[in-house]
Amino acid sequence: MLIIISTPIGNLGDITQRAAHLLAQADIIACEDTRQTRKLLSLLSISSSAELWAYHDHNGAKVRPKLINVMKAGQQVALASDAGTPLISDPGYKLVTACLENDIPVTAAPGPTAPIVALTLSGLPSDRFSFQGFVPQKKKAARDALEESHLLTMTQIWFETPKRLAATLKMMAGIYGNRYCVIARELTKLHETLYRGMLADLAKQFEVAPILKGELVLVVEGADKHASQVSIEKITELLRTRMHKMSLRDAVEEVEDLSGLPRKQIYQLALSVSKNET
């Protein structure tokens, strides 16, 4: 069996009794960094005889089959990240998929996860949201990711590093427009801080006084459904790009989700694009 276990994102008091019990009972703990997990077990006074196996992006393909084999043999594996919930910006989902393909049971001991904590503290709408993970490191890839998401009408959640924060906020302001943003730093820790303001203002603030360290979560206001900035030209370009790699119907559905515009209007534009391309 595979058990996905959430660990504290800062405050050790956030570990659940069930998570602590399962960590103590596991035969193997698969984790990002064995040193960090060993330290966490010690700080939480969890006595465990489990083997600690490193499992991360760089060794996942090699370690995954070994984990599958030990679970097939009846051993219990706990999957834990350094902080928070596994599978959120880590390779854990590939292990879950492999378990399902091999009829290995999978369950979870839920708990803290930074994106949800930041969202609940942001004051932005939480009925619909999109978690985007880390902003890509390369400038072009970052710009492409922001262009791809700028029409989303739901609240967006991103991870970012202090070093790149000001540049990312400036790029967001240029692509998204000057939206409201909340930056959460060191969540649940002693120096937990939330910065609130418009993207352009926050970009200027952190150019002058950068954050030197700490894990950051950016919660950004979604696009206005009725914003005039959503031009026909932009929608047409989105359709054209997608219709090169998917059916007209699928392209219409995806652009409808991105833009919030009526399906009928998008469908007519898609027909026009299709006609012009032939």
PLM region descriptions:
Residues E32, Y55, A80-D82, T107-A109, ...:
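Structural motif
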